[in-house]
């Protein structure tokens, strides 16, 4: 039997370097990257790098050998090889100025078809929905880009069309569940076929060119090339699930014979589709309530009243109320407010919305409509206001959706300081730090209170002393006023003016009070005797206070942690270290957040103190002026 040589079996044969993979596939580096992105093949990290690299200590990019064998049978490899031949032939035609032949070759440009790759990577529709988060986020980002060297205009337009179609589905199915505004953009989460899909819609900022060292647009463009095919398949399936015509179309009643539709019907329809403010054409007449069947309550009742079933019932009831949250309300969006995110919010929950017709086509009613209930404004004041509507800031809509109820509009009026905008994506089970506002939202009795430091307690004592001094000053003033009144009474009425009958009555009252006091003292003495007898019968001893030594407690915790680390098996030590590191980073983040919160509370407290001092100063000055005027 032949003895196997070193690196002929085991981990050395499981991995292959990138250079060897390129040589095996006969592709260039750019084509190899493109193929790996489209097929979902990515580098691997071996357990023992030196063994995987056949004794070499140099750090190389490694792939699984079976993944490279898998790429050998891909039909796209032949298309990528055809690109080389196509480039050589077209360059030759340009050199000899054979433009007739060049035109013929350009018409036969080899195109890559990715349909079979999408079906291969996502065997079921649910698998595609699970991987839709990154897809939507990247498509929304590319839909805002202008025409660049590596991003053609057609690609940006395609991203814009696919994202608008997906938003139409979200509005029609009323599947939006959570929203949040952050520095990155607008976070949205929809529930589609039981899967939670989260994406980011970027803010409307002017495009800033980036260097190649910061952002590689070529690699991102390859991802977008695959994601556009995936999103097209997904939109087609979602639209047909709701009996909506795909591509999106409008009913014939909307396409009236006016000048706009007569000039260019295609641009008219595309503008109205982008407005997100009109119902789409359906293949059959199905009511909106029948689109997404709710959970069968009768079926749940058969399973008993377990905690899980009760929770599912409550969630189903909340979702049914949430889908009609803005029903019966009419909103008007001011010019300075971003239109698209708010239109998605309002229409997803049953509301009606419009805006200024000069901002974007698709407005359904004007600003002077008396039936408008809310106007969304993001400026400190307005010149003209209507009494019949509430003027609110955009955050009100997001907070209403996250709390699943219509909140009072008092805190969101023009010029008001907005309440904190809480994230709905916080998991109370996983996240250690929860803001006190969120705790108070769920349970008012769980408002977070941090332990006061010595400085804070000293400040509180100083405040109390100031208040006591003010109170003493006020009492002294009242005492002085009382003395002045009594002096005036003696001056005009005199103490001799008191009747003798009244003096007799007062003496009789004093005698009665003395008798009552004697009786009360006897009762108190009897009660104390009884208590003393009861105490003698009881055998309760006084307890001792044990002081906790913090140093010993900390030492015991450290020893326990070391013992726990020793008990971990050698193969699980890296995992144990990773878990401990994650725990430490979480604790550090929590400590930093609590520290920031304490600083914010201290600043607000100091501001309130300064306001109080200013108010006292103004009151003292006003009192001094009044005293001068009286004199």
UniProtKB/Swiss-Prot annotation:
Transit peptide found in the keyword field: no
Source superkingdom: Eukaryota
GO MF, one example: RNA binding
Composition bias type Basic and acidic residues, residue spans: 428-442, 526-538
One GO CC term on file: nucleolus
Bias-annotated ranges (Acidic residues): 453-471, 498-525
Coiled coil: 593-629
Region Disordered, annotated ranges: 428-471, 489-560
Positions with biased composition (Basic residues): 544-553
The keyword Lipoprotein is annotated on this UniProt entry: no
Keywords: Coiled coil, Nucleus, Phosphoprotein, Ribosome biogenesis, rRNA processing
Domain called BRCT: residue spans: 321-414
Phosphoserine modified-residue sites: 453, 457
GO BP, one annotated term: maturation of LSU-rRNA from tricistronic rRNA transcript (SSU-rRNA, 5.8S rRNA, LSU-rRNA)
Subcellular localization: Nucleus, Nucleolus; Nucleus, Nucleoplasm
Known role: Required for maturation of ribosomal RNAs and formation of the large ribosomal subunit.
Entry's family note: Belongs to the pescadillo family.
Protein name, as recorded: Pescadillo homolog
Organism, scientific name: Drosophila persimilis
